[in-house]
Amino acid sequence: MGRGPSIENRKNASDAKRGKIFTKIIREIGVAARGGGGDPNNNPRLRVAMDKGLTANMSKDVIERAIKKATGELEGVEYEEIRYEGYAPGGVAVIVDCLTDNRVRTVADVRHAFSKCGGNMGTEGSVSFMFKRVGVLHFAAGADEDAISEAAIEAGADDIVVYPEDGAIDVLTAADSYHAVKEAMAAAGRTPDHAELTFRADNDIKVEGDTVLQVKKLLDMLEDLDDVQDVYSNADLGADAYA
């Protein structure tokens, strides 16, 4: 009898989260199409954004409308890209990539998050030198390590990371060879469960004690901001932070 509202509330929360994800991907598709044209075959960044949309179960019609708005075939809002950098508690480096139609609002929101959670914003370039742009092809637990490793080497991947706790595998590539490696592995029958271009820290910082919750609070707060697309850090929070 008492379960109805609980189930409905969970569904509403799930729908809201899905809507926020869609909004961010649509912005990303728009910026990519406006900057490099609406043909994904000639616009690698657009191809990445479209793949992200399809992975999130976004319909092709929604993706097509986002592209048309960006290329001027349909009326739409223009967004600009902004990157903020700073430090979380414990000296953890943080990069915040945003797409916004109101720079003043966005910087105020990001600054508030850093301040509220005990961090501080830095200047441009203050932490980004600690990260590299890489492609990541993720294979979930249970994947065939030997077969994936062989396919990755043949495809020209840079590195292979196997997670001992569950056997999941990340195949790492240089940013400029991401698409080629992904397509070569798919042709070899090794399609990843998830793939993306991202930033990875050169060295992680082990975070312990009460600082774990402080850092996680900041990262979560930044992720929840409407104008924020991606948040990267060099924090190693440990498995308990996500339990």
UniProtKB/Swiss-Prot annotation:
Give the UniProt entry's GO cellular component terms.
Answer: cytosol
GO aspect biological process, one term: regulation of DNA-templated transcription
Q: Tell whether DNA-binding is among the UniProt keywords.
A: yes
Q: Where in the cell is it found?
A: Cytoplasm
The cross-references to Gene3D superfamilies, in alphabetical order and at most eight, read: 1.10.10.200, 3.30.70.980
Q: Does the keyword Ubl conjugation apply?
A: no
Question: What UniProt keywords apply to this chain's record, in alphabetical order?
Answer: Cytoplasm, DNA-binding, Transcription, Transcription regulation
* GO MF annotations, alphabetized: DNA binding
Please give the InterPro entries that the UniProt record associates with this protein.
Answer: Integrase-like_N, TACO1_YebC-like_2nd/3rd_dom, TACO1_YebC_N, Transcrip_reg_TACO1-like, Transcrip_reg_TACO1-like_dom3, YebC-like
What main location does UniProt list? cytoplasm
Task: Report which superkingdom the organism of origin falls in.
Answer: Bacteria
Q: Which family does it belong to?
A: Belongs to the TACO1 family.
Q: What is this protein called?
A: Probable transcriptional regulatory protein Smal_3128
